[in-house]
Regions:
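Catalytic-site signature of metal-activated, phosphate-bearing donor transferases
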Residues: 1-102, 112
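Alpha-helical positions within canonical tetratricopeptide repeat
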Residues: 79, 99, 137, 171-174
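Tetratricopeptide repeat
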Residues: 61-64, 68, 101, 108, ...
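Short coil turns that delineate tetratricopeptide repeat
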Residues: 75-78, 112, 116, 150, ...
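Start-of-helix register in tetratricopeptide repeats
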Residues: 82, 116-120, 153-154, 171, ...
Length: 206
């Protein structure tokens, strides 16, 4: 299960708008005067897959092509970065790991060197390189993900599990021990939380 915060409740006064050609996000028209609060509680959003777009057997490939075009035309750097990331996601979902990695790398080039966006993009990049059986690039991406946000254990958990697969047991154990010392991520301050890594993977490697 992947858990993430999302803006969904807004004041109906015209101060916010949806932005993006796909994977739209709610943004404030005037960021300087906007206020945002994370709502605590046992609330969940049901994500449906019932619209016409989801009946298209080539949905993810078509999405990737649309996002490529939007990326080429977009001047806003934040949206351009977002399009590159979701283009990578779309190629991932239609089982094109090489193209997915290419677009994640474009996204990473537009990100700051630290923080949530680059951390999660590097994790995604490493996952695609693992599919391509490139262990060096997989580990490089995940180490970079950890260095981008060293308070997060997720990248270390993935590294520890992969080192076990590579039969590098001693190093994997040390990485898992380090991961186990880090606190659970705060939902409102984390872009995406890969809960199985925190709940099971790290502890299994110990």
């Amino acid at each position: 299960t992947t858990r993430y915060p999302r803006r969904l409740l807004v004041k109906n006064d015209g101060s916010c708008e949806w932005v993006g050609v796909l994977h739209e996000v709610i943004t404030a028209k005037n960021a300087a005067t906007s206020n945002e609060t994370y709502v605590e509680g046992d609330y969940h959003v049901i994500s449906g897959r019932f619209g016409a777009r989801n009946q298209n057997p080539n949905k993810y490939l078509d999405d990737a092509h649309m996002l490529e075009e939007a990326y080429a035309q977009e001047q806003n750097q934040a949206l351009k970065r977002r399009y590159a990331y979701y283009c990578g996601q779309s190629y991932r979902d239609c089982n094109e790991p090489a193209l997915a990695a290419e677009w994640y790398e474009r996204n990473i080039e537009l990100c700051s060197k630290t923080g949530e966006e680059v951390r999660f993009s590097l994790i995604a990049l490493g996952t695609e390189y693992r599919k391509l059986n490139d262990s060096a690039k997989t580990l490089e991406a995940w180490w970079n993900a950890y260095n981008a946000a060293p308070q997060h254990a997720e990248a270390l958990g993935l590294i520890a599990e992969y080192l076990y697969v590579l039969e590098r047991y001693s190093l994997g154990l040390e990485v898992a021990k380090k991961a186990a010392t880090l606190p659970d991520p705060l939902p409102h301050a984390t872009l995406f939380v890969n809960e199985p890594v925190h709940r099971y993977v790290i502890w299994y490697e110990l």
